[in-house]
Amino acid sequence: MFLFVETIRPQQRGESLLETVIKVVPGERFTPYGLALKLGARVVLESSSSKKGRDRYSLLLLQEAFRVAQEGTEVYFVKDGRRSKVKANHRDILDVLMYFARQHSDPGQDFPFPAGGVGYLSFEFCRYCDTIHLNPAKPDPLELPDALFLFGHVFLIYDHYTDLIYLVGLNYKEASIDLEAALAAVEARVNDGDWSALGSVGAPYDAEVLPQDYDPDETYKANVGAMRQEVIAGNLLQGVPSRRLLVKTEMPAIEAYRRLRSSNPSPYMFYLDFGDYQLFRASPELHVKVKGGTAEIRPIAGTRRRGATDAEDRALEAELLADVKERAEHLMLVDLARNDLGRICQPGTVQVKDSYFIERYSHVMHIVSSVEGRLKDDKTGIDALRASFPAGTVSGAPKIRAIEVIDRLEPVQRRFYSGVVGHLSPDGSLDTCIAIRSALKKGDTMVLQAGGGIVFDSNPDRELEETYEKMRATARSLGLEI
């Protein structure tokens, strides 16, 4: 039974806008993950802070309306399996997302409202954000689009403060359904008592590391050495190479996500099901967030493993904060964040709000800072995303030179790794996170990847071990010790 129904009609918010239907139902008996499994969610967005506990909202995309993809310089509209080129005056997919978002207005609620889609930008999308030259012939064994966003007719938003469920229905000029009927069908499914979909939760699965065409450990150590030489030569202040791990497993990605979110609760947790492949993550690192005209970047650089005892944990924290190399690396990335925001923020508004504090997660701890600025009047979240992509924490400084060195050294395209995942709202607000501590499932192969910042005094063996530390939580969710 619906507790409350609101239909936001075009004449209320502007004649050109489409209506949004919101219905509210009790949610005390349910969990977001259980609902995601029961209802076959295509997208799950959740958050858990080490300081504040669980964030207020979890979001599920239940019924896909269409998707928008970018491959090379072409943008495609895909609906019901049929694909057509987007013929519009756009620079890239980000302009297209904004076009769809602006078919709606903000519903006046605090919860996330992704009318502009939910999806990812690959690392290689950076070539469309600045003058960056990447090797067009570089292998891409994952065969992924440069960017892909899902748009929904029906979302479920779970309010953890009130235990209420908001069912949100959206139509677009290019895709329309009976929203009242769609929301009623979801409400009936929520309350039908059939939870058989949860029967496979916790089932055992085997996992094994697969060989690659090159030795990932030795290649990574060689790349650390090569990146260090770029620093010595004065070409870079820092570079961030990465390495890949392939794991064979029949474990469904949604089950791996369940295990990861339980063992490694993080501020940014997501599961995205694109059909042929799934992407999931539990990680602390924001890319850029824009809300109410304020843009924020939170550089995370400097890592130590967690201690086995409280005393060891405190000792490792003190060691991390006293590490000259780690602090220098972190300062460079704070300066890079200030520079990125300075491109699209009002003069004099960019400032470091918090600096050099420690955040702890299940397997590692990090040094974190927060940089904020007020957007210029003619800028939106899309401009902030373009100006800051990719993050300095996964590329280096100077950013363009570091990206081109990464492209030369790494044997395959990164694709999902160190890109971003996020969603866009009608007013230009957005929330994006960096796709690290993440995994992609395609067929029976799970793909993990990690890297680290390289400066003058980096040690290849220590840097290699750090990549294992960063992948360990995800690997353990697959039942694999690395």
Curated annotation (Swiss-Prot):
Reaction(s) catalysed by this chain's protein: chorismate + L-glutamine = anthranilate + pyruvate + L-glutamate + H(+)
Activity regulation field: Feedback inhibited by tryptophan.
Binding site for Mg(2+): 329, 466
Gene3D superfamilies the UniProt entry points to: Anthranilate synthase (3.60.120.10)
Keywords: Amino-acid biosynthesis, Aromatic amino acid biosynthesis, Lyase, Magnesium, Metal-binding, Tryptophan biosynthesis
GO MF annotations, alphabetized: anthranilate synthase activity; metal ion binding
An example Gene Ontology biological process: L-tryptophan biosynthetic process
Pathway: Amino-acid biosynthesis; L-tryptophan biosynthesis; L-tryptophan from chorismate: step 1/5
EC number: 4.1.3.27
UniProt-annotated binding residues for chorismate: 302-303, 417, 437, 451-453
Residues annotated for L-tryptophan binding in this entry: 47, 267-269
A Pfam family hit: Chorismate_bind
Cofactor note: Binds 1 Mg(2+) ion per subunit.
Cofactor: Mg(2+)
Presence of the UniProt keyword Amino-acid biosynthesis in the record: yes
Record-linked NCBIfam families: trpE_most
Homology family: Belongs to the anthranilate synthase component I family.
Function: Part of a heterotetrameric complex that catalyzes the two-step biosynthesis of anthranilate, an intermediate in the biosynthesis of L-tryptophan. In the first step, the glutamine-binding beta subunit (TrpG) of anthranilate synthase (AS) provides the glutamine amidotransferase activity which generates ammonia as a substrate that, along with chorismate, is used in the second step, catalyzed by the large alpha subunit of AS (TrpE) to produce anthranilate. In the absence of TrpG, TrpE can synthesize anthranilate directly from chorismate and high concentrations of ammonia.
Subunit structure: Heterotetramer consisting of two non-identical subunits: a beta subunit (TrpG) and a large alpha subunit (TrpE).
Protein name: Anthranilate synthase component 1
Organism: Spirochaeta aurantia
Annotated gene: trpE
